[in-house]
Amino acid sequence: KKDGYLVDKTGCKYTCWKLGENKYCNRECTWKHRGGNYGYCYGFGCYCEGLADSTQTWPLPNKSC
């Protein structure tokens, strides 16, 4: 398991505006295929805890966002 910022296929962080506890980030992070335990908004990006090792996190190699 790992922690990190959730990214989309372009390598950009999932953006959020409500810092701290955030339903959107928590839902995205805890989806079955991502395997996260918890998600919240930190620095205007969705930060996830306990992600599956296979889930990509920011920064992605060769992607500038």
Curated annotation (Swiss-Prot):
Top-rank taxon, per record: Eukaryota
GO molecular function: sodium channel inhibitor activity; toxin activity
Keywords: Disulfide bond, Secreted, Toxin
Disulphide-bonded residues: 12-65, 16-41, 25-46, 29-48
Tissue: Expressed by the venom gland.
SMART domains: Knot1
One GO process term, biological-process aspect: defense response
A Pfam cross-reference name: Toxin_3
Occurrences of domain LCN-type CS-alpha/beta (ranges): 2-65
Subcellular location per the Swiss-Prot or TrEMBL entry: Secreted
GO cellular component: extracellular region
Protein family (similarity comment): Belongs to the long (4 C-C) scorpion toxin superfamily. Sodium channel inhibitor family. Beta subfamily.
UniProt domain comment: Has the structural arrangement of an alpha-helix connected to antiparallel beta-sheets by disulfide bonds (CS-alpha/beta).
More details: Negative results: does not modify the currents of the human voltage-gated sodium channels Nav1.1/SCN1A, Nav1.2/SCN2A, Nav1.3/SCN3A, Nav 1.4/SCN4A, Nav1.5/SCN5A, Nav1.6/SCN8A and Nav1.7/SCN9A.
Functional summary from the UniProt entry: A probable toxin that has no activity on the tested sodium channels (when tested at 200 nM) and is not toxic to mice, crickets or sweet water shrimps. It resembles Beta toxins that bind voltage-independently at site-4 of sodium channels and shift the voltage of activation toward more negative potentials, thereby affecting sodium channel activation and promoting spontaneous and repetitive firing.
Protein's name according to its UniProt entry: Toxin Cbo5
Organism field: Centruroides bonito (Scorpion)
